[in-house]
C-alpha cells in the first residue's frame, strides 16, 4: 500500500489540526459548568456524556495526518484513565496547551530536543511540588467529597463512600445498571482473584471486553485440562441445563481450549476458562476456599477424582461471575453458610499461629476474599441515555476516590496546578531548556482558564487573580465565588492531577520532536469507477 510523507512544519501543522479538533470537543466538558457531548452510536440511541476518554475514543478523522494528531491526544486520555481512572479532560487540556505553545517556539527556531529537556525538568519539579502540598484522605466524609466532585453529584459521592466503608478501600466495588429510577447500594458476598479469561473469544461483552455469567456452574480443579474428551461428559450435562460454566483449572490448553472457544462462538454453550489463582500449596488452599464459597468439590488426585468421572453435582454455582482479562469476581456463591464460617474460623486460627509476616499477609488476603463482600452500586435513571451517562460518571468517581486514598488530595478545579507555579518558575535553565520550562508554566493555568471559560467568564482574569491568591484558595465555578477549596470539599486526587500532567507532557514532547510523518494513502473506491460489464470471474 502506497504511503504519503510530510516533513517538519507541514507535518506538525497537519497533526496540530487533529489535536485541536479532538481537544476542542473534549475540553467543553471540564468543570462544574462544563457541557455535554453527544456521540452517534450505530444501531442504538446516541450517548450523551461529559467523560473525556469516552469522547476521545469516538473521534476518527478523515485526514490521515489530522487523525494521527488526534490519536496522540487520545493516548494521553487513555494512559491517564489507565493509571488514575479519571482526569482525562484535564490531561487533554494540558496536552493541547503544551503542544500549541511548544509549536510556536519550534516555528520560531527553538531546538525541539532542548524543549523536551525543559519540559521533562519542569514536570519532575511540578510532580514533587504536588506531592508536597498533598493531604491524606482521613475519613469517610472526605472520600464522599472526592466522589461528589468527580461525578458532579453529592449523592454519588455518598454511595461510593459507603461502599468503600463496607468493603474496605481495596475491596471490590462493581457498578451495574438498575431497572428502576433510583440508584442503590447493596453489598453481597463475593470473592475476587487475579486471574482472567484464557482467551478473549470468551467475552460476552466485546465493548468492555468482559465475560458476564448469570447463574453459572463452577468447575474447580487443580488439574491441567488438555483433552476436550475429559470434560465432554460434564459439559453435556451443563448444556442440558442451559446454564453457563466457569472452569477454574491449573491450565486449559490444546484441543480443550480450542473446542471451548469454538462452541462459545457457535453459541452451543457459554464457558469461560481461567487459571487457578496462587501457586503451590497456596493454590490448593485458594481452590478449596473457592469450592467452599460456591458449594463445589475440588476435582483433584488427592481425593482420587478424575475429570472424566465428574458429575454435575460436583460443580459449584454462584449468582453471577464477572471475568476480565486480569480478574475474576464470583458474586453470591451457593456454598453452605456453616462451611464458610468454619473455613473463616480456620483461616483466622492460622493467622494467629503463623510467625511469618508474608504468610500472615497472604492468609489475610484469603480471609478478605472469603469473608469480605462485593459492593454493588445499582445505577438508576429515567432513560437508557441518562443511565449510560450516569454510569460513566460513577465509574470515574470511583476511580477518583481510590486514587485519593492512594496518594492523597490537592485543591481542586485546577487550583493546585497554579499553586505550584512558583516552584516550577524557580528552575534555573538557559536557552531552549528554559523555553521548555516556560511551556509547562503556561500550560499549568490552562485547566483553570478552561473551567472559567466554560462558566462564561474571562479565563485570563481568573488565572491572574489565582496566581496572587493564598495557597488553597481558588475559584468555585459552580457559585462564581473565591473560596478555600480544601475547606469547601472541592478537591482532586493528587494521583489524577499528577498523571494528567505527566502524560500530557510526554505526548507534547514526542509531538514537538516529530520531524516526519508517514501516512497511508487510501485506496480509491472501486465503486466510483465501475468497469465494463463482463463474464463473472473475468478482469
Swiss-Prot record:
SUPFAM superfamilies registered for this protein in UniProt: GroEL apical domain-like, GroEL equatorial domain-like, GroEL-intermediate domain like
Gene3D superfamilies, alphabetized: GroEL, GroEL-like equatorial domain, TCP-1-like chaperonin intermediate domain
Sequence positions that bind ATP: 29-32, 86-90, 413, 476-478, 492
MF-aspect GO terms: ATP binding; ATP-dependent protein folding chaperone; isomerase activity; unfolded protein binding
Main location: cytoplasm
UniProt keywords, alphabetically: ATP-binding, Chaperone, Cytoplasm, Isomerase, Nucleotide-binding
EC number assigned by the record: 5.6.1.7
Entry's Gene Ontology BP terms: protein refolding
GO cellular component: cytoplasm
Catalytic activity: ATP + H2O + a folded polypeptide = ADP + phosphate + an unfolded polypeptide
Subcellular location: Cytoplasm
Superkingdom of origin: Bacteria
Catalytic EC class: isomerase
Subunit structure: Forms a cylinder of 14 subunits composed of two heptameric rings stacked back-to-back. Interacts with the co-chaperonin GroES.
PANTHER family: 60 KDA HEAT SHOCK PROTEIN, MITOCHONDRIAL
Alphabetical list of HAMAP family matching this protein: CH60
Family: Belongs to the chaperonin (HSP60) family.
Its job: Together with its co-chaperonin GroES, plays an essential role in assisting protein folding. The GroEL-GroES system forms a nano-cage that allows encapsulation of the non-native substrate proteins and provides a physical environment optimized to promote and accelerate protein folding.
Protein name, entry field: Chaperonin GroEL
Organism whose genome encodes this protein: Staphylococcus haemolyticus (strain JCSC1435)
Gene name in the database record: groEL
Amino acid at each position: 500500500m502506497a504511503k504519503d510523507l510530510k516533513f517538519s512544519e507541514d507535518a506538525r501543522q497537519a497533526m496540530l489540526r487533529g489535536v485541536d479538533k479532538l481537544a476542542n470537543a473534549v475540553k467543553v466538558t471540564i468543570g462544574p459548568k462544563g457541557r455535554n457531548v453527544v456521540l452517534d452510536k450505530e444501531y442504538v440511541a446516541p450517548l450523551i456524556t461529559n467523560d473525556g476518554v469516552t469522547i476521545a475514543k469516538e473521534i476518527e478523522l478523515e485526514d490521515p495526518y489530522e487523525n494521527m494528531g488526534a490519536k496522540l491526544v487520545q493516548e494521553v486520555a487513555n494512559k491517564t484513565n489507565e493509571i488514575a481512572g479519571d482526569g482525562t479532560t484535564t490531561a487533554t487540556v494540558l496536552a493541547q496547551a503544551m503542544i500549541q505553545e511548544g509549536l510556536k517556539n519550534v516555528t520560531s527556531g527553538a531546538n525541539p530536543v532542548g524543549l523536551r529537556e525543559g519540559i521533562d525538568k519542569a514536570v519532575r519539579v511540578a510532580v514533587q511540588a504536588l506531592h508536597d502540598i498533598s493531604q491524606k484522605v482521613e475519613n469517610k466524609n472526605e472520600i464522599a467529597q472526592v466522589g461528589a466532585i468527580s461525578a458532579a453529584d453529592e449523592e454519588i459521592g455518598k454511595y461510593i463512600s459507603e461502599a468503600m466503608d463496607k468493603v474496605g478501600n481495596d475491596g471490590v466495588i462493581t457498578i451495574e445498571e438498575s431497572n428502576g429510577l433510583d440508584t442503590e447500594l447493596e453489598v453481597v458476598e463475593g470473592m475476587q482473584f487475579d486471574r482472567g479469561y484464557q482467551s478473549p473469544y470468551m467475552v460476552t461483552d466485546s465493548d468492555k471486553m468482559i465475560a458476564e455469567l448469570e447463574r453459572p456452574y463452577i468447575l474447580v480443579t487443580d488439574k491441567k485440562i488438555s483433552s476436550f474428551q475429559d470434560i465432554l461428559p460434564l459439559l453435556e450435562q451443563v448444556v442440558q441445563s442451559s446454564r453457563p460454566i466457569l472452569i477454574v483449572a491449573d491450565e486449559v490448553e490444546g484441543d480443550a481450549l480450542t473446542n471451548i472457544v469454538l462452541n462459545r462462538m457457535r453459541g452451543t454453550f457459554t464457558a469461560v476458562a481461567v487459571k487457578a489463582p496462587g501457586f503451590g500449596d497456596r493454590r490448593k488452599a485458594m481452590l478449596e476456599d473457592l469450592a467452599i464459597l460456591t458449594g463445589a468439590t475440588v476435582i483433584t488426585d488427592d481425593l482420587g477424582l478424575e475429570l472424566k468421572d465428574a458429575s454435575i453435582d460436583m460443580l459449584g454455582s454462584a449468582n453471577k461471575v464477572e471475568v476480565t482479562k486480569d480478574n475474576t469476581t464470583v458474586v453470591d456463591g451457593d456454598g453452605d453458610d456453616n462451611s464458610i464460617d468454619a473455613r473463616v474460623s480456620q483461616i483466622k486460627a492460622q493467622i494467629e499461629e503463623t510467625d511469618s509476616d508474608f504468610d500472615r499477609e497472604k492468609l489475610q488476603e484469603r480471609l478478605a476474599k472469603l469473608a469480605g463482600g462485593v459492593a454493588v452500586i445499582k445505577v438508576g435513571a429515567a432513560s437508557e441515555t441518562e443511565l449510560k451517562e450516569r454510569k460513566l460518571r460513577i465509574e470515574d468517581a470511583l476511580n477518583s476516590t481510590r486514587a485519593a486514598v492512594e496518594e492523597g488530595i490537592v485543591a481542586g478545579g485546577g487550583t493546585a496546578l497554579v499553586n505550584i507555579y512558583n516552584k516550577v518558575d524557580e528552575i534555573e535553565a538557559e536557552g531552549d531548556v528554559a523555553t521548555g520550562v516556560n511551556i509547562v508554566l503556561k500550560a499549568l493555568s490552562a485547566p483553570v482558564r478552561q473551567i472559567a471559560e466554560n462558566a462564561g467568564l474571562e479565563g485570563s482574569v481568573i488565572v491572574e487573580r489565582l496566581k496572587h491568591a493564598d495557597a488553597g484558595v481558588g475559584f468555585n465555578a459552580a457559585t462564581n465565588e473565591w473560596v478555600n477549596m480544601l475547606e469547601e470539599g472541592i478537591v482532586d486526587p493528587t494521583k489524577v492531577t499528577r498523571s494528567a500532567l505527566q502524560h500530557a507532557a510526554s505526548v507534547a514532547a514526542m509531538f514537538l520532536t516529530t520531524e516526519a510523518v508517514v501516512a497511508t494513502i487510501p485506496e480509491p473506491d472501486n465503486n466510483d469507477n465501475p468497469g465494463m460489464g463482463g463474464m463473472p470471474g473475468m478482469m
